[in-house]
């Protein structure tokens, strides 16, 4: 499997936390050392609220930062935004570690055995199946035992890949 371009991975993450507007704003921010909200709005042709919403989402994940300067003419503040390139990789690594811990907790709760309905495909843990008297609550078919849990296998694969990514990124930081 070919390795993804780091910028594409970053933009994929930005898209997942801030949507397409977030990607547009982030790409534009990458072009400047810093830029005001007003300039961003004009450059991108977006509504000020949409730009601001995207910026706040990006800020929540430590991808961008801001500072303000008082406008001498009218006393209002002008907010300037920038990509904090120095802490960007550390923040992304921190997010990956948090996701990894959540996935590991989820993996611990997954059971090796599960029950499924052969008619409609719903899946149940042992406790859930027992609660339904081993009968599908949707269609009434008897539930069957499956020895290997595909969700658990998928989680194990994702956890392993994420651990490898984190290890690699820690070695280069």
Curated annotation (Swiss-Prot):
PROSITE patterns, A to Z: HTH_TFE_IIE
Function: Transcription factor that plays a role in the activation of archaeal genes transcribed by RNA polymerase. Facilitates transcription initiation by enhancing TATA-box recognition by TATA-box-binding protein (Tbp), and transcription factor B (Tfb) and RNA polymerase recruitment. Not absolutely required for transcription in vitro, but particularly important in cases where Tbp or Tfb function is not optimal. It dynamically alters the nucleic acid-binding properties of RNA polymerases by stabilizing the initiation complex and destabilizing elongation complexes.
GO molecular-function term, one example from the UniProt record: DNA binding
Domain notes per entry: The winged helix domain is involved in binding to DNA in the preinitiation complex.
Annotated InterPro entries: TF_E_archaea (IPR016481), TFE (IPR039997), TFIIE/TFIIEa_HTH (IPR017919), TFIIE_asu (IPR002853), TFIIEa/SarR/Rpc3_HTH_dom (IPR024550), WH-like_DNA-bd_sf (IPR036388), WH_DNA-bd_sf (IPR036390)
Subunit (UniProt): Monomer. Interaction with RNA polymerase subunits RpoF and RpoE is necessary for Tfe stimulatory transcription activity. Able to interact with Tbp and RNA polymerase in the absence of DNA promoter. Interacts both with the preinitiation and elongation complexes.
One GO-annotated biological process of the protein: transcription initiation at RNA polymerase II promoter
PANTHER family linked to this entry: GENERAL TRANSCRIPTION FACTOR IIE SUBUNIT 1, TRANSCRIPTION INITIATION FACTOR IIE, ALPHA SUBUNIT
Top-rank taxon: Archaea
Organism annotation: Ignicoccus hospitalis (strain KIN4/I / DSM 18386 / JCM 14125)
Family to which this protein belongs: Belongs to the TFE family.
Domain HTH TFE/IIEalpha-type: residue ranges: 6-89
Identification of the protein by name: Transcription factor E
Keywords, comma-separated and alphabetical: DNA-binding, Transcription, Transcription regulation
């Amino acid at each position: 499997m070919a390795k993804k371009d780091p910028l594409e991975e970053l933009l994929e993450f930005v898209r997942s936390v801030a949507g397409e507007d977030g990607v547009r704003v982030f790409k534009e921010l990458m072009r400047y050392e810093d830029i005001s909200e007003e300039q961003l709005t004009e450059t991108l042709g977006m509504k000020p609220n949409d730009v601001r919403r995207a910026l706040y989402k990006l800020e929540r994940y430590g991808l961008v930062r801001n500072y303000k300067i008082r406008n001498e003419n009218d006393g209002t503040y002008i907010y300037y935004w920038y990509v904090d390139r120095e802490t960007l990789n550390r923040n992304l690594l921190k997010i990956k570690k948090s996701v990894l811990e959540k996935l590991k907790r989820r993996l611990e709760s997954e059971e090796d055995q599960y029950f499924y309905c052969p008619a409609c495909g719903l899946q149940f843990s042992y406790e859930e199946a027992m609660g339904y008297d081993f009968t599908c609550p949707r269609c009434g078919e008897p539930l069957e035992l499956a020895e290997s849990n595909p969700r658990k296998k998928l989680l194990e694969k994702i956890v392993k890949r994420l651990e490898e990514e984190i290890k690699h990124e820690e070695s280069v930081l």
